[in-house]
């Protein structure tokens, strides 16, 4: 980060249930200080199978939980004293981390209530397994309408869309790889809902797979669906697949 001035770094999506807003803010501010103000924090409520099955923490009322989490997190990131007492979460105090910018916060919002909360209060949403039709007709409009109704200016919120990408001539084999590698997402309710909205049978349909021309065409569909930032997840483990995919993505990024 110190050697390259134009690269940003983001956390991906960090679950909120297993760390308090004070700890999350402390980590985010420290990272942003190290990154020279180029760090973006992503948060989300993860899935019932994770919170209840792995951690023994209730997943119920997840929208309320996230709202109260932001009540504590956002002021702390801005260097402010916070005194937020909610039904599910309490955050009181302040952090003493001088000379650090407030990092942007993105939320992994897919459903309408989460998107509206995101539009009102944060920098945007990070999507996964969400195709261009759903991005254009559901994700962007729901979030941006909520932002406008909250009095926020145009461009206040952004859509960052993440999808698997593989440039290959062996489409059948790589689709099978995608179906196997990303199978779990077809069974998690939030992602399953996005796949169903798009008319996709499974995660392999959401993945951008094909030769350079095909991948460029599908990426253009995503770009014109109101996406501000695209997060490519190369997944073909072969050396040729990795090289072709990264070369294609670099050429598109430079345009």
Give the location of each predicted region:
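Active-site-adjacent structural elements that line small-molecule/cofactor binding pockets in enzymes
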Residues: 1-255
């Amino acid at each position: 980060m110190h050697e390259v001035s134009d690269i940003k770094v983001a956390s991906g999506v960090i679950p909120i249930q297993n760390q308090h807003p004070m700890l999350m803010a402390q980590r985010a501010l420290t990272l942003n200080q190290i990154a020279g103000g180029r760090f973006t924090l992503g948060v989300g409520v993860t899935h019932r199978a994770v919170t209840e099955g792995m951690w023994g923490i209730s997943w119920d009322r997840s929208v309320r939980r996230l709202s109260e989490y932001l009540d504590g997190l956002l002021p702390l990131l801005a260097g402010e004293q916070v005194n937020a007492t909610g039904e599910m979460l309490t955050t009181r105090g302040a952090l003493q981390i001088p000379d650090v910018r407030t990092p942007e916060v993105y939320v992994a919002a897919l459903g309408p209530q989460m998107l509206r909360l995101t539009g009102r209060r944060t920098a945007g949403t990070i999507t996964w397994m969400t195709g261009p039709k759903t991005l254009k007709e559901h994700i962007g409009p729901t979030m941006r309408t909520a932002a406008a109704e909250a009095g926020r200016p145009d461009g206040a919120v952004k859509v960052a869309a993440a999808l698997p990408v593989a440039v290959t001539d062996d489409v059948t084999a790589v689709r099978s790889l995608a179906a196997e590698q990303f199978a779990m997402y077809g069974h998690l309710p939030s992602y399953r809902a996005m796949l169903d909205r798009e008319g996709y049978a499974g995660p392999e349909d959401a993945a951008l797979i094909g030769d350079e021309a095909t991948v460029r065409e599908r990426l253009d569909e995503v770009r014109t669906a109101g996406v501000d930032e695209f997060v490519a997840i190369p997944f073909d483990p072969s050396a040729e697949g990795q090289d072709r995919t990264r070369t294609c993505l670099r050429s598109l990024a430079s345009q």
